[in-house]
Amino acid sequence: MIRPPASRSAFFLAAAVMVSGCASYRLGPVNPAISAGQAIEVGLFQNATPQPGLTESVNASIRRELQRDATFELATGGDGDVLLTGNITAYRRSAVSFQPRDILSVRDFEVELVTRILAAEKATGKVLIDHELTGRTTVRLGGDLASAERQALPLLANDLARKTVALLAEGEW
């Protein structure tokens, strides 16, 4: 059966449109600065806020997320290819919802942890990533603010750790 030229042209046009949609898709890690499999050493994060206990929670969460993600190797003992450090610059809380019968009493609030992430090659000191990330979580205020913030800290650190490892693996968009 011989097809008319118009239907053949329409077929090729449709095929070209479908194939061009995949042209920008990339397989694997997209960050050329840090290749997969490199060993990342997590250094201490500096806490520039008055909120205590942030450094330990953030460091532990980033180490755990690096192991879970498995794109990079977690270096221990100073043998890493890349040194990851950071500076926790802000800890903010803002009201999200209030008690139904008392508009002055907060029921839920959002906590934000703003951190400047710095990844540098250990051998040369060349900065690979210098980026500000914000971890967020929402917390229901139960009895008192201090216990609610203690419960929110692991969630906040985990959100920041997920964003940090995604930045290392996928690069800046």
Question: How does the language model describe each region?
Answer:
Residues 2-5, 116-130, 162-170:
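Short secondary-structure transition/capping segments
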Residues 49-60, 106, 110, 146-159:
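Soluble non-cytosolic domains of exported or imported proteins
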Residues 87-92, 130-135, 159-167:
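A general structural signal for short secondary-structure boundary/capping elements
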